[in-house]
Amino acid sequence: MLQISFNGARLKEARLFNKKSITQIAEFLNVSKQMVSKYEKGRATPSEESLEILEKKLKFPRDFFFGNDNFSLSSTGTFFRSRYTATQTEKMPAEINKNYVALIRDYLGEFIDFPNLDWGLSGLDYTPQEYASYIREKWELGDRPIDNLSLLMEEKGFVISRIDTQSDKVDAFGSAVKVNNNEYYVVMLEGIEYSFYRQQFSLAHELGHWLMHEKECLEECLAHSTCSINVSYANDGILTLVTQLGISFPALRETYTVYI
């Protein structure tokens, strides 16, 4: 009979997803921090009682902690559009969600013919103004306002998802995720109560990062889990795209304190 062993990496994943520290898990289980560390490193297995507590506190099913990955997954450094006070603990649930979205997209790709992203459009030697014109020409947008940037980006091969991790310090983020031999660019919008215009702005920002920074991110940020945004770039280049999206300036001013 095949015996499935406890997967410590899954415990760590569930812990980070729930923004919990090793100390907090140790308190839940009434064990030492060293023991929790052993669990996560696969050097020890929690008792049945401890497993029941983990299921309840972390809200992951028991089978999750005994599963094994049958895929390979890697991600470039993530561009977060967030406040400077956002911590790694606050960003981690969104990071894990991003990977889940990429896995779902990869699975569904076996049954659905999704559009393919043209990676050759990113990393070209253009100014933000030139890039805005170039993309409009390549995507045959003309001079008309873009009514729904989310739909447009999905039609062009981006993977867009909305989540709510109860974070008020992260608006949106995106990065390339490779599942087995398939690469996707996933853009996550944080929160479910933001206005349509704010989501449009966030998507324009992430599109700008993909166009101008994705290859730079791949080369320079692999040693880090996240990449900070360049504020001067955001205030200069991204607004060039935003002003062509059909967003009303009063709404933009109210949300971002941006004056055009």
Model-derived features: positions:
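Short juxta-domain linker segments that transition from a proline/glycine-rich
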Residues: 1-260
